[in-house]
């Protein structure tokens, strides 16, 4: 497992546990009591460490390479998933995954950023940084869901939209704006979940939902801490300071009413117990969809638009 800097004391204890278990395999020494005591220390240290994470530490957890990504959630939560590809204008962008499936018996359209889990898949999915064709694909799938009256689930996990010259030449800003516009206009329930990183316009292009959920240790911000530090302090080395100022944690954003609910993560983060994370998110999604089911399409659309317009009015009165 990839160990974060602040997790090293925990990892050392876990290493001792593994050593003792290895010795115990020989059957010569009964060390069950010692293992039990060390495990209790690990659990206590995990709780105390993760209960007081700084914004910068939460940023590291949100970026953890073993954190579950969109494809993992789809394979666990969605039955009969049928992937849909291409923007019908230029190309397929595998930074955004989307398709139809069934969630707890109901048909849904699910769309999300995919970062990949190793070198090969990270390159394939462009580290979750979508190009214009990715956002145009998302727009197409949302319009399809609207046409067939199918609820939409979006999973957000990106450092930001791809900033390359080729993406700009193909209208990156326009594609993001059209995706946001489509989110605001559909007349079906739309539930968005920030599962890892929620970076800038590349994130909000899929996060303009009726209900916005956010995992406990995810982050959501107008800019990355490194990008903010490079602008304000002229050095990315001040990323820790920038993270403190950006109010990017789920807890801060819930207080500011930017998100609707914080979804608890397993002790030690989603990467330590992906199965439990899937179960918890499944229940949260089911509850959110139930709350929205039965509402008229016009009401869903009006509430969603008003929700985000109200954010823009903050501090004006």
Curated annotation (Swiss-Prot):
Q: Which reaction does it catalyse?
A: N(6)-carboxybiotinyl-L-lysyl-[protein] + acetyl-CoA = N(6)-biotinyl-L-lysyl-[protein] + malonyl-CoA
Instruction: List the PROSITE patterns.
Output: COA_CT_CTER
Gene Ontology annotations of biological process type:
fatty acid biosynthetic process; malonyl-CoA biosynthetic process
Q: Which UniProt keywords apply?
A: ATP-binding, Cytoplasm, Fatty acid biosynthesis, Fatty acid metabolism, Lipid biosynthesis, Lipid metabolism, Nucleotide-binding, Transferase
E.C. number: 2.1.3.15
Quick one: which pathway?
Lipid metabolism; malonyl-CoA biosynthesis; malonyl-CoA from acetyl-CoA: step 1/1
Example GO CC term: the record gives:
acetyl-CoA carboxylase complex
Report the GO molecular function annotations: acetyl-CoA carboxylase activity; ATP binding; carboxyl- or carbamoyltransferase activity
The record's subcellular locations are: Cytoplasm
Q: Does the keyword RNA-binding apply?
A: no
- CoA carboxyltransferase C-terminal domain: residues covered: 41-291
Domain of life (superkingdom): Bacteria
Give the matching Pfam families: ACCA (PF03255)
InterPro entries linked:
Acetyl_CoA_COase_a_su, ClpP/crotonase-like_dom_sf, COA_CT_C
**Keyword Ribonucleoprotein annotated:** no
Protein task:
Component of the acetyl coenzyme A carboxylase (ACC) complex. First, biotin carboxylase catalyzes the carboxylation of biotin on its carrier protein (BCCP) and then the CO(2) group is transferred by the carboxyltransferase to acetyl-CoA to form malonyl-CoA.
NCBIfam families referenced in this protein's UniProt entry, alphabetically: accA (TIGR00513), AccA_sub (NF041504), PRK05724.1 (NF004344)
Q: Please name the PANTHER family in this protein's record.
A: ACETYL-COENZYME A CARBOXYLASE CARBOXYL TRANSFERASE SUBUNIT ALPHA (PTHR42853), ACETYL-COENZYME A CARBOXYLASE CARBOXYL TRANSFERASE SUBUNIT ALPHA, CHLOROPLASTIC (PTHR42853:SF3)
Q: Which HAMAP family match?
A: AcetylCoA_CT_alpha
* Family to which this protein belongs: Belongs to the AccA family.
* Assembly, per entry: Acetyl-CoA carboxylase is a heterohexamer composed of biotin carboxyl carrier protein (AccB), biotin carboxylase (AccC) and two subunits each of ACCase subunit alpha (AccA) and ACCase subunit beta (AccD).
What's the name of the protein? Acetyl-coenzyme A carboxylase carboxyl transferase subunit alpha
Q: Which organism is it from?
A: Paramagnetospirillum magneticum (strain ATCC 700264 / AMB-1)
Q: Which gene encodes it?
A: accA
């Amino acid at each position: 497992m990839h160990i974060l800097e602040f997790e090293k004391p925990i990892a050392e204890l876990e290493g001792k546990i593994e050593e003792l278990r290895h010795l115990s395999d020989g059957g010569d020494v009964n060390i069950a009591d010692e293992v039990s005591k060390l495990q209790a220390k690990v659990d206590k240290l995990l709780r105390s460490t993760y209960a007081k994470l700084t914004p910068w530490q939460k940023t590291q957890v949100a970026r953890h390479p073993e954190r579950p990504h969109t494809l993992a959630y789809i394979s666990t939560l969605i039955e009969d998933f049928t992937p849909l590809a291409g923007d019908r204008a230029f190309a397929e962008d595998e930074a955004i995954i989307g398709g139809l499936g069934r969630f707890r018996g109901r048909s849904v359209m699910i769309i999300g950023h995919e970062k990949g889990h190793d070198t090969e898949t990270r390159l394939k999915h462009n580290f979750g940084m979508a190009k214009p064709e990715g956002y145009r694909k998302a727009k197409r799938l949302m319009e399809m869901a609207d046409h067939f009256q199918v609820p939409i689930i979006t999973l957000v996990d990106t450092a930001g939209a791809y900033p390359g010259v080729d993406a700009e030449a193909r209208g990156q800003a326009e594609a993001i704006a059209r995706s946001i516009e489509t989110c605001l206009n559909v007349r079906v329930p739309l539930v968005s979940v920030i599962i890892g990183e929620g970076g800038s316009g590349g994130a909000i292009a899929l996060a303009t939902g009726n209900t916005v959920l956010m995992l406990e240790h995810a982050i959501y911000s107008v800019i990355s801490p490194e990008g903010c530090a490079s602008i304000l302090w002229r050095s990315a080395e001040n990323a820790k300071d920038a993270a403190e100022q950006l109010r990017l944690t789920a807890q801060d954003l819930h207080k500011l009413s930017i998100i609707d609910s914080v979804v608890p993560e397993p002790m030690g983060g989603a990467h330590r117990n992906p199965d439990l994370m899937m179960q918890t998110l499944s229940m949260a999604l089911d509850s959110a969809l139930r709350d929205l089911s039965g509402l008229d399409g016009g009401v869903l659309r009006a509430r969603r638009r008003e929700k985000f317009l109200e954010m823009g009015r903050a501090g004006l009165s």
